[in-house]
Swiss-Prot record:
Matches recorded under InterPro entries: Aldolase_TIM, TIM_sf, TrioseP_Isoase_bac/euk, Triosephosphate_isomerase, Triosephosphate_isomerase_AS
Organism: Mycobacterium leprae (strain TN)
Assembly and binders: Homodimer.
Enzyme active site: H100 (electrophile), E172 (proton acceptor)
CDD domains with a match to the protein in the record: TIM (cd00311)
Signal peptide: none
Protein name: Triosephosphate isomerase
EC assignment: 5.3.1.1
Keywords, ordered alphabetically: Cytoplasm, Gluconeogenesis, Glycolysis, Isomerase
Subcellular location: Cytoplasm
Domain of life of the source: Bacteria
Lineage: Bacteria, Bacillati, Actinomycetota, Actinomycetes, Mycobacteriales
Length: 261
């Protein structure tokens, strides 16, 4: 089955709302409309930028989409500092990151919470981009595949096969996040193939063939082509390179199969 590539830009805690507008304008200028037929492009700004991005995307009728970097497992109530998926949906978000390694590491988010947030995203018609991945010490002892499959099961616990079909999965080896190190194309394929196999066990092989599985970790114009060319890699979650509009657009063009404009 042919799955449309997805390139998602995770801005992390960078850029105020003025800077966000400038970056989205740069991406739109650098990425001609014809490429959107082959690749979906989304940006994931900080919460405080979302309204400005929405106004620009809607006003200029841009084809890229946008989403958030996290959400609450709750819809409403006395949860100080939380952001509801219902609020994100009202802002026109299409996607939301769930379980990024930085949330798991710095905020102690475990698989059960990730599963609850994933369910909350789906409840509010948001597409959750669920992140899983291993630390270097796990890879070095050869347990990276089983670790990722276990993490996937925990992060999707309680979801129906139909719900699983509406999720995007990201394999982000923690040792490659912001380090400049990157998994080889073969490394990415090995784990993404195992993820798809596990999705087949959790839902069905048919559902697994429809789910987009991305790679994340120090992606750039030199390495993304080989990685997204792998059979089970359907795009990328881009970190630092997503803060440069021209570079991010180039990654999207490569994921679309080129040629560069």
């Amino acid at each position: 089955m042919s799955r449309k590539s997805l390139i998602a830009g995770n801005w992390k805690m960078n850029l105020n709302h003025f800077e966000a507008i400038a970056l989205v304008q740069k991406i739109a200028f650098s990425l001609p409309d014809k490429y959107y037929d082959k690749v979906d492009v989304t940006v994931l700004p900080p919460f405080t930028d979302l309204r400005s991005v929405q106004t620009l995307v809607d006003g200029d009728k841009l084809r890229l989409t946008y989403g958030a970097q996290d959400l609450s497992q709750h819809d409403l109530g006395a949860y100080t500092g939380d952001i509801s998926g219902a609020f994100l949906a009202k802002l026109g978000c299409s996607f939301v990151l769930v379980g990024h390694s930085e949330r798991r590491t710095y905020h102690d988010e475990g698989d059960a919470l990730v599963a609850a947030k994933t369910a909350a995203a789906l409840k509010n018609s948001l597409t959750p981009i669920v992140c899983i991945g291993e630390y270097l010490e796990i890879r070095e002892v050869g347990e990276h595949v089983s670790h990722c499959q276990n993490q996937l099961r925990g992060s999707l616990a309680g979801l129906s096969p139909e719900q699983i079909g509406n999720v995007v999965i990201v394999y982000e080896p923690v040792w490659a996040i912001g380090t400049g190190r990157v998994a080889s194309a073969a490394d990415a394929q090995e784990v993404c193939e195992a993820i798809r196999k596990e999705l087949g066990a959790l839902a069905s092989p048919q559902v697994a063939e429809t789910v987009r599985v991305l790679y994340g970790g120090s992606l750039n114009a030199k390495n993304i082509g080989d990685i997204v060319a792998q059979q089970d890699v359907d795009g990328g979650l881009v970190g630092g390179a997503s803060l440069d509009g021209a570079q991010f657009a180039t990654l999207a063009v490569i994921a679309a199969g080129g040629p560069l404009p």
